[in-house]
Amino acid sequence: MSNKQIFLKFKSGEIILNNFNKYTDSISSKLLFYQNIKNQENNSGNENYKNFNYNYKNKNNYNNNNNNNNSNSSSNNNGSNNNIKFNSLFISSIYLYNNNNSNNNDLKNDKNDNSIGNINKIIKPKIEIQDLLNPFEAIKEIVGNKEDEEINLVKIGIRVLELGLILLPSVLTFPCCFIPGVKELWWQLLLETIQFSGTCWIKFGQWISTRPDLFPDLLIEKFSQLHSQCPSHSFQFTNESIENSFNGKSIKDLFLWFDEEPMASGSVAQVHKALTMDGKVAVVKVLHPNVKSNIKRDFFIIYSLIWAFSHIPEMKWLSLPESILEFGKSMMKQADLELEASHLNRFNSNFKYNSEVIFPKPLYPLVSKEVLVESFEPGSPIMDFIKKNDHHNPTLAKIGLSAYMQMMLVDNFVHADLHPGNVLVRTSDDDNFKSIDNNYFKKYNNDNDQQQQQQYNLPFKRKLYDTIEKSHKKFDSMLGGIQLKSIDFKEHQKSSPKLIFLDVGLVTQLGQQDKDHFIELFTEIVNGNGKEGAELLIRYAREAKCTEEEMYQFKERMGTLFNQVQNSKLSEVHVGQFMSEILGLVREYHVKIESNFATLVMGTIVLEGLGKQLDPSLGLLKAAIPFLLKSQVFSFSNFIKDFFLKSKTSKKQLNNDNNNNNNNNNNNKNNNDNNNKNNNNKNNNEKNK
């Protein structure tokens, strides 16, 4: 077979091989850095890692000059384990093929590049920042309808006047924020003003607290205190929402019992406890009145202000209108409860083999855009365990850390609204009381089977187990008028606690390339390579407006930060504080990073903060290593699968093309034979005549 035929055979596969450079740049460093982790923990072996990496790159350059692949690989992998050696050999063979059959000269250009694991530079093309959308175009972007009835200038004007009156006390007393004895009172006034301004403004303040790459530390600290406990709406509106969502069926048609008093009320929705017709204790989440139209109206005002300020030259680098646009989209997603139900399904699927992590389950068909019915998951707020220094705390810290690392590094599907209010803890006692709760409801339903639904009313608290005396023998309930003669607590053996994650309306997903970048940054943190980490941030930034001198300063200061990691054990590194300082440098030197990237960093900071309160000895970086490796194995295996699938497809396509060509040739031959035969017959006929 000629070289040309070989090239044709793998022509579609060649594209995959070119893309393979992205994986090898990431995978090689991740497969190798695990060895470096062990060496750092033992305070030895750093040089072996660097020497191995240097030989690894020389080996690839050697392959690029068409020398013997196998002998060179075996001679330059001293000190590496068998797995690393195997992957090095595999990657070398791929590169040998790629460089012999394409015009890829990237390896030649990287001979003098000493960055760790950098076989082929991945230079992310600069994303051109689009022209600023005006406020009306921005609304169209988040709702898909420019002619939205709520975007009415008269209504907007009235709302602006209303907000002006609400904000007036804070504006007039603004100088007080500089007076030491009074400034805390002023900040408290501002926070309460934002709370009173409505859903969008509360969420806007919370969003600001998650972007230390854009806003100063003081603002981040103060706005992180905003909470979403808001006034509840009427039970009548809840009933109307349920009827409108489920084909006119009322609460009495869908539930055996429904608590009219909400369990909690947030900025977007409120939740009630109920009992479904099949005897399941459930939570019913109902959107507040006009929440979507209010979000769109207030978003229009916020975006208009930011859009006006963005024309100031000093503000342009922030690209705030783009960030606010992403904020608006996330707000609209949180107001779609069908989407939240799909998120719950995804999380339950991702953690189906992990019994220590629990997400509520949507109870179909009782799911709509305005109403979501999900399983009731009893538990205690995680802050209760932090305050009393419970013996479960170290276990809880490990469970939470593992869950978040799986979301971020393996599943690439991350809960983006993690705060203590959205995390509950369930112990074995909670499981017992949940069983009592369900049995109580079922017994009540069976005993009153002949009664009409409107006749019953259960006068007990929302959490039934709060009213139950913890007895190992019997329990008599006078509140419901029913006596449960014997409820035995058989599960008194100690079991590991479980974490329950709530409110998953907002999630974060990174593209594959951004995910690889995030993992690369983690790798450089572990290795203590500050300058390489700075180069990563600049290389993958959406925009970096640094002069050469500023870029040099940025790299030097990053190097100083990373040296702190290099000189410490991984278990002693405070990742949250470290990443906060990184984002501070990003803001100071005007390096614009992706919003999802910043969200993940903030999630990591919040997670470590909770984890350290539960277990001060928690080491986030050390615990992340298995998940980093697992994510790379998944990426690598998916690539291999995809590569061979595409190669098989291209081979099949080539065979089909060859068969088609053969068929065409045969058809042409048959046509020629028929034409010749017809001509001969015609000549014979003429001759006979």
Swiss-Prot record:
Active site per the UniProt annotation: 417 (proton acceptor)
Keyword Transcription: no
Keyword list, A-Z: ATP-binding, Coiled coil, Kinase, Nucleotide-binding, Serine/threonine-protein kinase, Transferase
InterPro entries hit by this protein: ABC1_dom, ADCK2_dom, ADCK_kinase, Kinase-like_dom_sf
Ranges where the Protein kinase domain occurs: 257-689
Documented EC number(s): 2.7.11.-
Pfam families (UniProt xref): ABC1 (PF03109)
Region (Disordered): 42-79, 652-689
Residues annotated as binding ATP: 263-271, 285
Gene Ontology terms, MF aspect: ATP binding; protein serine/threonine kinase activity
Protein known as: Probable serine/threonine-protein kinase abkC
Gene of this entry: abkC
